[in-house]
Amino acid sequence: MNKFSEKDWKIFRSKIAGWQEAYMDKLNKEYIEILSGDGKPSEKFWTLEKRIKEDKKDCGVQCEMSRSNQFYFMISLLNEGAIFMDDLEDFSDDLKEIMQHFAGL
């Protein structure tokens, strides 16, 4: 699905790195909580290892940039909590409506 304008694509490209950095900062804080929690060091290690393995698949961590996948990346970012509808204020109304509909917001 590629219904978005060239302007929306340029905005997306300009924002994705910042969104990913903010999302990874949030994840790092959650990892610190895991490591600081109660339990055996080995349990915390393996819990964290499993979590990182899952998290690194998120678009908020990494995604291969392509305009044809912009829709899917943005839906994933919304569903992961890497971005919120407020983060889309610079985008076209059409894009915001589509995101709101498909993200179930």
Predicted regions, residues:
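Acidic, Ser/Pro/Thr-rich low-complexity regulatory regions
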Residues: 1-105
